[in-house]
């Protein structure tokens, strides 16, 4: 299943607030469609599927990409759910978003794809690049890159920068100081249900 490119607000109405996908919040509190207002008890599988979809859409991943991250988190040992969230949060596109250099993860991915961002002084055009403590992320030193990022910064997606990141607005330079802690993950998610979803898939 490829990455979703359809109407974002429709997804937000179905799954709830997804800070990485869209700055918009739904006016209606129920899902879209003819039976959106009908409330029925969800099965355990439906709850697991919904949490998995929230994770996928928020971080802009294909099904195959998310499965790869789940397998990587399992191999790492410790809490699979927490490791999974940390892997996703430390992606370059998400790190740019959390630094406030882009209003959404799709906007951050565009910055990366078009070569507007440097990591440790080099252009990195891979959105899935896994940031590590000590990495320095900054705007490319050209007018087009700086202006685009400065425009993005006028409409930040989230108010606060997580404690594992630092950002200098004057130089448009951010630094990764560590790995994100669970309480700083902005998405409301039950990661255990995601792990359970993939466990039953084998």
UniProtKB/Swiss-Prot annotation:
GO terms for biological process: ribosomal small subunit biogenesis; translation. Residues 90-152 form the S4 RNA-binding domain. GO terms for molecular function: rRNA binding; structural constituent of ribosome. Residues 17-42 are annotated as: Disordered. Gene3D superfamilies: Ribosomal Protein S4 Delta 41, Chain A, domain 1, RNA-binding S4 domain. It holds the Pfam family Ribosomal_S4. Keywords: Ribonucleoprotein, Ribosomal protein, RNA-binding, rRNA-binding. One of its GO terms (cellular component) is small ribosomal subunit. It comes from the Bacteria. Belongs to the universal ribosomal protein uS4 family. HAMAP family: Ribosomal_uS4_B. Part of the 30S ribosomal subunit. Contacts protein S5. The interaction surface between S4 and S5 is involved in control of translational fidelity. One of the primary rRNA binding proteins, it binds directly to 16S rRNA where it nucleates assembly of the body of the 30S subunit. With S5 and S12 plays an important role in translational accuracy. NCBIfam families: PRK05327.1, rpsD_bact. This is Small ribosomal subunit protein uS4. It comes from Acaryochloris marina (strain MBIC 11017).
């Amino acid at each position: 299943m490829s990455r979703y490119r359809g109407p974002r607000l429709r997804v937000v109405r179905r799954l709830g607030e997804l800070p990485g996908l869209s700055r918009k919040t739904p006016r209606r509190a129920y899902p879209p469609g003819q039976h959106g207002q009908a409330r029925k008890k969800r099965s355990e599988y439906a709850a697991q599927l919904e949490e998995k979809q929230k994770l996928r859409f928020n971080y802009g991943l294909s099904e195959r990409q998310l499965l790869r991250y789940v397998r990587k988190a399992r191999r790492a040992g410790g809490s699979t759910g927490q490791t999974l969230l940390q892997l996703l949060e430390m992606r370059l596109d998400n790190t740019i978003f959390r630094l406030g250099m882009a209003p959404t993860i799709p906007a951050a991915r565009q910055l990366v794809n078009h070569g507007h961002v440097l990591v440790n002084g080099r252009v990195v055009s891979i959105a899935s690049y896994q940031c590590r403590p000590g990495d320095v992320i900054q705007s490319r030193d050209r007018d087009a890159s700086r202006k685009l990022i400065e425009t993005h910064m006028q409409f930040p997606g989230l108010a606060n920068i997580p404690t594992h990141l630092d950002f200098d607005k004057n130089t448009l330079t951010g630094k990764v100081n560590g790995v994100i802690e669970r309480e700083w993950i902005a998405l409301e998610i039950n990661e255990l249900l995601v792990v359970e979803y993939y466990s039953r898939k084998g």
